[in-house]
Amino acid sequence: MRGLVFFPPLLPGELLYSALARHGVLSGLTSPKGLMKDLYGRANMIATVDLPNNLSTLLGRLPSRRSAARHLIGGHTLYGYYTAFQSLELRQMAFEAMFGGEGSVHFLLGASVFRTGRPAYLQFCPDCAIQQEHDH
């Protein structure tokens, strides 16, 4: 399986989901399936904002493997938020599921039963976005 020629550097505090979307924009990929095929080698992948999985496949395709799994999961997903009060065993299971699995990490961590649900769209602070654009 071929690797990616280009992948944008992850910005401080940036979610992996954002970097994946940025890769699509910068690469001219307009189809979500085309983007997943480019990133994972398979079009049937589903990107999640907070707890992505199959990261071993993605890491294996990146042009620079500086983004080690622990750094990627710990620094660019919401893994820390969802696992802050979980046992070490459950945190390790979630990490492994995100790294190599295709199962639902949300289900494993009990996040699929939240009554409030998840927002229908991503939210952001316009002032913060301007500051980030200036900084990066």
Q: Where is each model-derived feature located?
A:
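Short, non-ligating residues that shape and space the ligands of small metal-coordination modules
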Residues: 134-135
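A structured, charge-rich N-terminal accessory region that forms the first stable segment of a protein
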Residues: 1-119
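Short, cysteine/histidine-rich loop/knuckle motifs that typically chelate Zn2+
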Residues: 124-129
